[in-house]
């Protein structure tokens, strides 16, 4: 079986290659950005016509931080729309039997109920700072739903929660909270600092899923005979930012103290995915946060030593 993994150079795509690369009956097909521009419709069409994969996982996306999303919303909307539309349509045209499109928890309304269920999609305004990216991901989800409805193809979507793991982005300004903490505490330990400052009260609660668990969930979903049109993927458990920070400090070996600045903003008090549907189907995350952080820190050190740190 030929499996095309779009976006294999990213954190998620890398985990998917690790997960499926060891299966004897699976031939993983992948292309670098230089080899295949997924925004280019003609190039994508030619690729599917030549390779004719049996299955596809769309993990490719143009991603960035709040500043980039706010400054270049047209680019984020256009590029991510093009990636979704080109891959989904060409997959349909060239006989792909199964396609899994990966979205994001940002598709749900800013003031969605917590935990966020799948059926709260399109029930309220989105978070303005990443609206363009979210709209593109919603469109990809709906394309899969409508191609399935109209043409009978088994195209479906998965919406993961906050992800972390090997190959993450550790940029000091543009990374997400968990990899940013890993880098900050590693550098503080190396510099012998006695104190690290943190924003806010530390009380907001967040959910984190190791990327290898996401890859396992994708394999599980691709084995289902009749999967939902879209489904949340997460741990179903949460941790305070304070608890996360203390765990990262311990894992990195930082011996100093953490000081909190309550004058700084906290952000949303809670953001958690409702994973009851996936649990009912028989899948649960296996990697707990402490274990996942230890694996992530080990990969961070290896990537840094090899000069391959994404930053």
Region spans (language model):
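Glycine-rich "substrate-gating" loop/helix at the edge of Rossmann-like oxidoreductase active sites
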Residues: 129-133, 161-176, 200-212, 235-237
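C-terminal substrate-binding subdomain of Rossmann-fold SDR/epimerase-dehydratase oxidoreductases
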Residues: 6-7, 11, 15-19, 187-311
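Conserved catalytic Lys-bearing alpha helix of Rossmann-like short-chain dehydrogenase/reductases
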Residues: 81-87, 136-144, 178
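Conserved beta-loop-beta element that borders a ligand/cofactor-binding pocket
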Residues: 98, 103-104, 141-169, 179-182, ...
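NAD(P)H-binding glycine-rich loop region in Rossmannoid oxidoreductase-like domains
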Residues: 41-81, 93
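Adenosine-cofactor binding site in Rossmann-like domains, unifying the SAM/SAH pocket
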Residues: 21-46
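Conserved catalytic-site region of short-chain dehydrogenase/reductase
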Residues: 66, 101-116, 132-138, 149-150, ...
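Conserved Rossmann-fold NAD(P)-dependent oxidoreductase catalytic core, especially the SDR/UDP-sugar
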Residues: 85-130, 156
């Amino acid at each position: 079986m030929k499996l095309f993994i779009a976006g294999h150079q990213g954190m998620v795509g890398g985990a998917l290659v690790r997960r499926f690369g060891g299966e004897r009956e699976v031939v993983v097909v992948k292309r670098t950005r230089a080899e295949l521009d997924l925004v280019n419709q003609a190039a994508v069409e030619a690729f599917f016509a030549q390779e004719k994969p049996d299955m596809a996982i769309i993990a490719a996306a143009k991603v960035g931080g709040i500043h980039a999303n706010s400054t270049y919303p047209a680019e984020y909307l256009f590029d991510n729309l093009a990636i979704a539309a080109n891959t989904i349509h060409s997959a349909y045209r060239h006989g792909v039997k199964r396609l899994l499109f990966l979205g994001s928890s940002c598709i749900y309304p800013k003031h969605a109920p917590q935990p966020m269920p799948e059926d709260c999609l399109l029930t309220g305004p989105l978070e303005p700072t990443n609206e363009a990216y979210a709209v593109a991901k919603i469109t990809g989800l709906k394309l899969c739903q409508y191609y399935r409805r109209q043409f009978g193809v088994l195209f479906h979507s998965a919406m993961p929660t906050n992800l972390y793991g090997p190959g993450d982005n550790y940029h000091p300004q543009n990374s997400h909270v968990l990899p940013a903490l890993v880098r900050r505490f590693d550098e503080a330990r190396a510099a012998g600092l006695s104190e690290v400052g943190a924003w806010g009260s530390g009380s907001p609660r967040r959910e984190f899923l190791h990327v290898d668990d996401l890859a396992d969930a994708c394999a599980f979903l691709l084995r289902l005979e009749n999967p939902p049109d879209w489904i949340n993927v997460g741990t179903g458990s949460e941790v305070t930012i304070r608890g996360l920070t203390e765990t990262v400090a311990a894992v990195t070996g930082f011996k100093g103290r953490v000081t909190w600045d309550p004058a700084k903003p906290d952000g949303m008090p809670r953001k958690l995915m409702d994973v009851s549907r996936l649990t009912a189907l028989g899948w649960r995350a296996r990697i707990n946060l402490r274990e996942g952080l230890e694996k992530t820190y080990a990969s961070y050190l290896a990537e840094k030593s090899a000069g391959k740190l994404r930053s």
